[in-house]
Amino acid sequence: MDSFLSQPITIVLAILSVLLYNIWKIRKPSNKFQKGMKLPQLSFALPLIGHLHLLGNQIPLAKTFASFADKYGPIFQIRLGAYPTLVISNKEAIKECFTTNDKILASRTKSTHGILLGYNHASFACAPYGRFWAKIRKVTMLELLSSRRVESLRHVYESEIDTLVKDLSLYVKVGKVEVVISEWMERLTFNIITKMICGKRYFEYLQDVDDVEANGNIVKLIKEVMHISGELVPKDVIPILGWFGFEGEVLKSMKRVSRDLDEVVGKWVEEHIEKSDDGVNNSNEKQDLIDVMLSVIEDDPDSGNDRDTIIKANIVNLMIAGSDTTSTTMTWILVLLLNNMNALKRAQEEIDQHIGRDRKIESSDIKNLVYLQAIVKETLRLHPTLPLSIPHEATEDCNIQGYYVPKGTRLFTNVWKLHRDPSIWLEPEKFSPERFINENGEIDHESHQFEYLPFGLGRRACPGSMFATQVIHIAVARLIHLFDFEVPINEVVDMKQGTGLILSKFTPLKVLLTPRLPYELYQ
């Protein structure tokens, strides 16, 4: 956001604000649906820029919107440049949006992000609601991320976790050793996702940071994508700037990153096409996701997207959704356990009780590790994958909580605020995995419907949630089973968050690791 406000746009705005004020005026609602109350709206909107001037600081947008909700209520309207935007953070509004009005609110906004990083909105995450989106969503759910497909790829993430554990044991060996564990989590999740997508892994865990940066250009690109995905492109909210050919630093960076990404993923697709043409792949060989997409995705003349473009768009989508988000969640789990050592001890005792100390944990064991599952759920409550949802757009006029919402209104769900609502959660700022365990000692899956949304809700809910939680559970379980974790002497665990799309930990997480099981279990 700072990069947006730091541009010399203010000069342009000062000159144009009087002449072009009428362009900014709120569009009149259609006469056929003028029912309902007027939405609470923030004060101090300015011509052309709306309320953008209230967002220009280092506070994450979800937290800024939460402070607005404290003043205006859990459903309010803010104007982002030329566009009215609805922000909701209570379960009643969320239920109405994603049940009664789910279809109306299932579309995405047209954006520079979708054009450049989504290959002109060709991925399932950013395509507008309609026939093309439904087609790609079906392919994703049935072919790429179905329970059958995830199970067929289980060997990928289990073998990668085995490799990480082995290399960690070589690094730690005996005694306490300081490890920047957040970097290991990043390499783990990126190796898993690229191996699933294209059959390649990019890192050995014992590489130093300089080697990673030199050899892992794709990782650097993904990090840049995650950063700029949380930034506004000026012309997306003030269209007049596009007419004058204005390009800010965010747009310039986005164009560069999209070119570099296309070169990498385009090469992956070409390699798979060549192998297929040469008859290298056969029905008995384990297929990666590019193989699958090449076999099920076709050109789509109606949307103007050819097969390879659709595949590349969804490769990028899968990498963004499956790498940085998962490693961030695992890092926050370890942060919270280090700050709550009794919870870490209880989790280790649960594992020792059910698995023992003479064999490694298998995926089939996770169902018996109730407290571990509760730890993951509680971490996702405090640190949801997307604290602020990717914006939706209303395709028709509708009513939400008695308020009139006109067609074209954009919608944010403030998950961060919802998950810390004191009317829902007892001591919402406290880390308490027990809140997700019912009186029978089982995970409570029923009590928090429309109150707990770590992976979204409705038609646009994250299709990869099952895969992500499986990886998180087994990786964290293996780590805390095999190692004791401590904070380095004279250090505290810094809880500061970044300001990007997923609010990752601002500083790397350093821990002291000590092996706790027989040597052969690390091999």
Swiss-Prot record:
Annotated keywords: Cholesterol metabolism, Heme, Iron, Lipid biosynthesis, Lipid metabolism, Membrane, Metal-binding, Monooxygenase, Oxidoreductase, Steroid biosynthesis, Steroid metabolism, Sterol metabolism, Transmembrane, Transmembrane helix
GO CC annotation, single: membrane
Single GO MF descriptor: iron ion binding
Keyword Kinase (UniProt): no
Gene3D superfamilies attached to this UniProt entry: Cytochrome P450 (1.10.630.10)
Residue sites binding heme per the record: 462
Pfam families documented for this protein: p450
Functional pathway: Steroid metabolism; cholesterol metabolism
Biotechnology section: The coexpression of CYP90B50 and CYP82J17 in the yeast strain RH6829, which was engineered to accumulate cholesterol, leads to the production of diosgenin, the main precursor for the industrial production of steroid hormones.
EC number: 1.14.14.-
Xref: PROSITE patterns: CYTOCHROME_P450
Organ and tissue specificity: Mainly expressed in leaves and seed pods and, to a lower extent, in flowers and stems.
Bilayer-crossing regions: 4-24
Subcellular location: Membrane
Gene Ontology BP, a term: cholesterol metabolic process
Membrane topology type: Single-pass membrane protein
Keyword Lipid metabolism: yes
UniProt signal peptide: none
The organism's place on the tree of life at top rank: Eukaryota
Protein family: Belongs to the cytochrome P450 family.
Function: Involved in the biosynthesis of spiroketal steroid and saponin natural products from cholesterol such as diosgenin and analogs (e.g. furostanol and spirostanol), plant defense compounds used as main precursors for the industrial production of steroid hormones. During the 5,6-spiroketalization of cholesterol, may catalyze the 27-monohydroxylation of furostanol-type steroid to an intermediate product that undergoes a stereospecific formation of the terminal heterocycle to yield diosgenin.
Protein name (database record): Cytochrome P450 CYP82J17
Source organism (scientific name): Trigonella foenum-graecum (Fenugreek)
Classification of source organism: Eukaryota, Viridiplantae, Streptophyta, Embryophyta, Tracheophyta
Gene name, Swiss-Prot/TrEMBL: CYP82J17
